[in-house]
Curated annotation (Swiss-Prot):
Belongs to the com family. It comes from the Bacteria. This is Cryptic Mu-phage protein com.
Length: 62
């Protein structure tokens, strides 16, 4: 099981084996986090988790 943490404050958000789409608000720093576990191009060698974090009017993508 993998631990998923907020990229801003490192708070543990949840633990999961797998997921397709998660939207969560960090209870500590209040950032809105959207995580997608999908490959846009499955033939590429490095496919993995994509994460987009939004805060106020600012959007941060990981």
């Amino acid at each position: 099981m993998k631990s998923i943490r907020c990229k801003n404050c490192n708070k543990l958000l949840f633990k999961a084996d797998s997921f397709d789409h998660i939207e969560i608000r960090c209870p500590r720093c209040k950032r809105h986090i959207i995580m997608l576990n999908a490959c846009e191009h499955p033939t590429e060698k490095h496919c993995g988790k994509r994460e987009k974090i939004t805060h106020s009017d600012e959007t941060v993508c990981y």
